[in-house]
Amino acid sequence: MLGVASVAGGKDDYRVDMASEASTLDRRLGMTVPLPGPLHSHKEWLHELADVGYTDIWSAESDSADGFTPLALAAAWEPRLRLGTAIIPAYTRAPACMAQSVASMADAAPGRFCIGIGSSSNVIVERWNGVPFEQPYRKVRDMVRFLKEALEGEKVSREFDTFSVNGFRLGVRPEHTPPIFVAALREQMLRLAGKESDGAIINWLGADDVPQVASIVHDAAGGESREIVARIFVCPSDNTQVVREAAKFAIAAYMNVPVYAKFQEWLGRGPELEGMWAAWSGGDRKAALAAISDDVVDALIVHGTPDQCREQIGRYLDNGVTTAALALLPLDKELDQREAMRALAGA
């Protein structure tokens, strides 16, 4: 089963080192929620996820369900799954409100909940929520530090760089303090994840990019174990050209958001995306899509038969990922998402 077994090790010492770091932690297989359909209909889906071998579910928060409600339902419905947010923006909840939500989830699912915090993007934070997208590194760092204090039951009175808290103490003290993960793209945030949190959450990268990212986290951790949770976009379909053409829309939408554009440049993919960026900035969306190569699609989107997809996901795990949090993309309209979910677990 993919969540507990992996393909052969890396090709060079660097990747072997990353695989060695990952091997100290259980390899886990997760699915992104919410699942298709209304939230009240997900109970049987969640049971089936656990039945076929998934260990985790990870929520997202953008324009659909909030990041906590699907997990709260899962906490009551399916006790076999670990529950995580990937991610909650550090900007869109005030500190005390954030601490209450985190503590409540940890109380509802003792020992099974992980909180993932990140900067999100200027689109979600500023354009959709009306909050200035300023000092993202400091904002995430401050929220992580505040949550660590608050979740330990301490009375927090402190001037952080990006907010202040005066006399707050949580009224809910979870039996188990939840791990805190940091969503990270480039070096500064990756170092924060390694130094001050329990792990990093990464996305929009290929399997071959993982060692570059994971090494920074582990170096910053100074020898302590850190999880690397990767959201991996997957479409198990062998209708290759249909998937590739549809994937280009998703890639263009994300890679023109400044934080993701800079991430791809840092990974070394800038030259491959220059044509797309130039066409997009010039207002020619059709040319921008055409400029995205099949190689870029194949690096960022896992697709092919279920066996091929499982092999590609295994490469992420071999290269340093500890939890593969799959996100099913219905890029092929013929895709049966429930069957795809089963097939990706090897069921």
Predicted regions and their residues:
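Active-site-adjacent structural elements that line small-molecule/cofactor binding pockets in enzymes
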Residues: 2-347
